[in-house]
Amino acid sequence: MSIPRFLKVTYGAYDNYIPVSELSKKSWNQQYFSLAFPKPPRPGKKRRSLPSQLQNNTAPVIDEEKLGVHRPPLWMHRSLMRISERPSVYLAARKGLIPKPLHFGKGESKSVGTHKSLASEKTKKEVKMKKDGFEAKEKTALKTDKEGSPKPAKKNIPRDSQKDKGRVSSDSEGEKAGVKKGSKKVKNTPKGKDSASESEGEKAGSKKEAKTTKKGSKDKVSATESGGEKAGSKKEAKATKKGSKDKVSGTESGGEKAGSKKEAKTTKKESKDKVSATESGGEKAGSKKEAKDDKKDATSSQETLLSTAADKDGKKKEEKPVKQSSKSKDTVKDSASEKGDEKKEDKKEGKKEKKKKDGEGKEGGKKEKKDKKDKKDKKDKKDKKDKKDKKEKDKKDKKDKKDKKDKKDKKDKKDKKDKKAK
């Protein structure tokens, strides 16, 4: 056959697939046609109103007199007498809530029409109301948009300024580092950096002070000097409690750097340092480290004051032999023997510093506890005083109110007397 067995049929919005065979097509069409177009009433038959189209679903009032006269036929079953169709919830919702009409006798069909017209009027009113509401909302939204438009412009200004600030900061890292240092300085910051000469001594001093605190940072330093001196610095690193991984850099002699690093490593936890070739780079790094360290320990700055005095003397003595070794690179053996002596001295100094720190830490702890206790006591006293003052104030207020009331009462009595007299 040329006609396909199954067809995809779509009805309105419903896009579901309905396979219809050739045999059942006729009955299927008949059924659906009857749904769309109801059959015309047969002549001589009364039209029965459907309960789904009536709002009152109350049980019909049965007149017993009429039933007595007109009895239902014997063959009719009780289930057939009842109307099986339930009132449709869908139609009720469509119509809207309409007050239940009185029970109609014969003119039931007329009442249905009136209900429908009422419902249509109601729906029209609702639609109008909705439209008005929507328009009002739109107007308010427009107003808010107009008012809100200047606000973002104001907000943009600080953003631009922030960007400018960012550019400035990226241009001068050194300045920023200085500012950080200034803001986060504790009362007892060491001020002995300037005493050293303009050579590596300055770098060493700043690094040393940074490393005296318990926690340090990691360092990469790249080398251009002799291999013998590098080897010496590596040996020294291993000798300390917790050594650091060093790659030595710069335009100056590696021996000088080794000397300065050695002193720094005597503290509890050593750090791995990034040191750039130029002096400014070294100073920046030192200042940033100091800023971080100040955050962590305020107490450590006191310890540095004690340690720097001893370290400076040792550093100045060590710098002289190291400078000679840098001038003549052949005298590596002599410097090695000196380094051995310096290591021993450093270890001794480290032990002394450790003992001092332990003592100071205990004393600091006691002090802090005492301070806390004093603060608490002061606060308690203040609270008690405040409570007392509050109570007194309340009493005063009550007294004032009472006095006012008494005065008012007296005045009222006086007025009444005057009126009576008149």
Curated annotation (Swiss-Prot):
Keywords: Cytoplasm, Cytoskeleton, Developmental protein, Differentiation, Repeat, Spermatogenesis. Residues 50-59 have a biased composition (Polar residues). GO terms for cellular component: cytoskeletal calyx. Residues 39-59, 101-422 are annotated as: Disordered. Residues 179-263 are annotated as: 3 X approximate tandem repeats. InterPro entries: CYLC, Cylicin_N. Residues 25-421 are annotated as: 38 X 3 AA repeats of K-K-X. Residues 118-149, 157-178, 191-298, 310-368 have a biased composition (Basic and acidic residues). Testis. One of its GO terms (molecular function) is structural constituent of cytoskeleton. GO terms for biological process: acrosome assembly; maintenance of cell number; manchette assembly; manchette disassembly; single fertilization; spermatogenesis. Its main location: cytoplasm. Plays a role in the establishment of normal sperm morphology during spermatogenesis. It is required for acrosome attachment to the nuclear envelope, and proper manchette elongation and disassembly. This is Cylicin-2.
